[in-house]
Amino acid sequence: MTVIFPNFSKSSVLIVGDVMLDRYWYGPTDKIAPEAPVPIVKVNKIIDRPGGAANVAMNIASLGARSRLLGLTGVDEAAKILKKQLNESNIKWNFISVRTCPTIIKLRVMSRNQQLIRLDFEQYFNNVDTTKLLKQVELYLPKYKVLVLSDYAKGSLNCIEEIIKLARYMNVPVIVDPKGIQFSRYKGATLLTPNISEFESIVGSCRNEKILINRAQEIIIDYNLSALLITRSERGMTLCTRYAAPLYFSTQKKKVYHVTGAGDTVVGVLSAALSSGKSLEKACFLANLAASAVIKKSGTSTSNVTEMKNIMNSHICTTLPVGILDEKTLKQTISVVRNRGEKIVMTNGVFDILHSGHVSYLTNAKKLGDRLIVAVNSDGSTRRLKGKTRPINTLEQRMFILAALTVVDWVVPFYEDTPSRLVAYLSPDFLVKGGDYHVCDIEGSQGVLNRGGTVRVLNFQTGCSSSNIINAIKRKN
């Protein structure tokens, strides 16, 4: 994916949510306490950083974008520290001071780059009249291009349904970083960004990618969302939308020091990029670059454009759509993997009733290279090739089953009688067919050979064919 970094100074984001102070006590650990089997930490450094929704604002500010933060705090020293640090980062804020509740503090004790314990100083903001907060949102929302709702389930967003309705009325995109199992609260939002644990707490354990994608689509439909972005720590991110194939934003394996605040970084960079006019896909790409940077840092951190560019230039982070793709998207994806030196294998067929012969053949085809494309005859093409009674399964059904195979990277349909045009357009390194073909008889073979590619004929499992299966069923009936 080719991404030009936006001019973030033109971005504007309104953040509403649970603000908190992340406090860190650092010190060496050399011995065990005599009164209990616990380590003694000699604290020699204390660091305070804005956390929660405030960390989202810090990440936006680190890009040079304009933002405003709305939320609830107590009337205490922590609130003063939080406001001071936000001022130093040129972040505008409007907090409602609640005398009956303290400002939320998350205290982490750190030693030798390890977190030993976390102590939470907080009280749920219940019985707090959020009318003032709603009025502030109504006042400031027209001045910003994107709205972020950072929900840590601390009570600041008890009026979240009304805020989302207001944003929809004003036609402002809403990004929600959710918490808890009541996703119905976020109905009508543009995008939800749960981490994998939060997502599975709603839909149950996802044993494989296909289950995860299907359940994500159900969430999108049930709650009238435009998209769902699932963050997966060092495994990157998965973007699901209503009508397009899922996108996987993966990171190379690296040492992960801390994931504290990584979700805030994703939401912050994502919102700033969307506000600048980037597409959702490119905004997610940039957010994943930033997350790749912050998980290597200690404590609550932010990322900047320079770090993101360095990661992109070193090819640490890539984005690859998988599964069923259109020709244009597939062509772009092939270009990405080719730049990394990967070899492309392509085959084609009807694949009407998938059987063990198909699976064995596709497995052997994949071994020739790094990525396997399966081009599938359309229903009309199949009828012209096989007769009026075929296909048994529709094009959509056949492609769905093929995309579920782990050896298949991409599935693409073609509507002509032969795949020659598609083969020429995609230019695979290996063109493969199974059966008794001669290389010169394989459609598209000459073009592949002329470009320096390879054409191979693989053995097909004897006796295995869709036609044989259909005839056997007819005989039994």
From Swiss-Prot:
Single GO biological process annotation from the record: ADP-L-glycero-beta-D-manno-heptose biosynthetic process
Region (Cytidylyltransferase) location: 346-477
Keywords: ATP-binding, Carbohydrate metabolism, Kinase, Multifunctional enzyme, Nucleotide-binding, Nucleotidyltransferase, Transferase
InterPro entries (alphabetical): Bifunc_HldE, Carboh/pur_kinase_PfkB_CS, Cyt_trans-like, PfkB_dom, RfaE_dom_I, RfaE_dom_II, Ribokinase-like, Rossmann-like_a/b/a_fold
Catalytic residues as annotated in Swiss-Prot or TrEMBL: 264
Catalysed reactions, as listed in the record: D-glycero-beta-D-manno-heptose 7-phosphate + ATP = D-glycero-beta-D-manno-heptose 1,7-bisphosphate + ADP + H(+); D-glycero-beta-D-manno-heptose 1-phosphate + ATP + H(+) = ADP-D-glycero-beta-D-manno-heptose + diphosphate
Region (Ribokinase): 1-319
Signal peptide per UniProt: none
SUPFAM superfamilies for the chain: Nucleotidylyl transferase (SSF52374), Ribokinase-like (SSF53613)
Top-rank EC class of the record's enzyme: transferase
GO cellular component, one term: cytosol
Record's keyword annotation contains ATP-binding: yes
EC number(s) reported in the record: 2.7.1.167, 2.7.7.70
Pathway assigned to this chain's UniProt record: Nucleotide-sugar biosynthesis; ADP-L-glycero-beta-D-manno-heptose biosynthesis; ADP-L-glycero-beta-D-manno-heptose from D-glycero-beta-D-manno-heptose 7-phosphate: step 1/4; Nucleotide-sugar biosynthesis; ADP-L-glycero-beta-D-manno-heptose biosynthesis; ADP-L-glycero-beta-D-manno-heptose from D-glycero-beta-D-manno-heptose 7-phosphate: step 3/4
A GO MF term: phosphotransferase activity, alcohol group as acceptor
Binding site residues for ATP: 195-198
NCBIfam families hit by this protein: cyt_tran_rel, PRK11316.1, rfaE_dom_I, rfaE_dom_II
Subunit structure: Homodimer.
Family as reported in the entry's similarity comment: In the N-terminal section; belongs to the carbohydrate kinase PfkB family. In the C-terminal section; belongs to the cytidylyltransferase family.
UniProt function note: Catalyzes the ADP transfer from ATP to D-glycero-beta-D-manno-heptose 1-phosphate, yielding ADP-D-glycero-beta-D-manno-heptose.
HAMAP family to which the protein is assigned, alphabetical: HldE
Protein name per the record: Bifunctional protein HldE
Organism from which the protein derives: Blochmanniella pennsylvanica (strain BPEN)
Name of the coding gene: hldE
